[in-house]
Regions:
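Two-component/phosphorelay signaling modules centered on CheY-like receiver
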Residues: 7-28
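C-terminal output helix
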Residues: 97-106
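Conserved phosphotransfer microenvironments
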Residues: 43-60
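Acidic, metal-coordinating helix/loop segments flanking the phosphotransfer/catalytic sites
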Residues: 28-41
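Residue-level signal for the "D+5" position in two-component response regulator receiver
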Residues: 28, 50-51, 86
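A short, hydrophobic beta-strand element within the central beta-sheet of small alpha/beta folds
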Residues: 68-79
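Conserved acidic carboxylate
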Residues: 6-7, 75
Length: 107
C-alpha cells in the first residue's frame, strides 16, 4: 500500500506512522507541489505552510492521476468536517490521530 502524507508538522507525521502496523510505502511531503506519484491514500493536514489543506485536496482531486487515491483531510476540530465534505475529501480524521479511527480509514 502506498501512503502519502502532506504536512509541515513533525508530530502529525509521527502520530500517523506510529499506528501503521502493516506493510506500506510511505512518502512525506511538505507541500502539494512535490506530489508526483499516485498513492492509495493521501493524508493532507488542515494547514500546510501557507496553504490550506482543503485547497490541497481540491487541487489534487482535479488531477486524474489521483482519481483512485483516497484523500483524507486531517482536521483540527469537529467544525472542520464541513470543509472536508465541501472539497470532496474521501474522509477526515480529527487530530491528534488515534489508532481506532485510523484503522477505520483502511477498512
Amino acid at each position: 500500500m502506498k501512503i502519502c502524507l502532506i504536512t509541515d508538522t513533525e508530530w502529525v507525521k509521527d502520530s500517523l506512522l506510529k499506528y501503521l502496523d502493516f506493510d506500506y510505502n510511505f512518502t512525506h511531503l511538505i507541500g502539494s507541489d512535490d506530489i508526483k506519484l499516485s498513492y492509495d491514500y493521501i493524508f493532507v493536514d488542515m494547514q500546510v505552510n501557507n496553504n490550506g489543506g482543503p485547497s490541497i485536496i481540491r487541487e489534487i482531486s482535479r488531477d486524474n492521476k489521483f482519481a483512485n487515491s483516497k484523500k483524507i483531510l486531517l482536521i483540527d476540530r469537529e467544525a472542520d468536517i464541513f470543509q472536508a465534505k465541501r472539497v470532496g475529501a474521501d474522509g477526515h480524521l480529527l487530530k491528534p490521530l488515534d489508532k481506532t479511527n485510523l484503522k477505520k480509514v483502511f477498512t
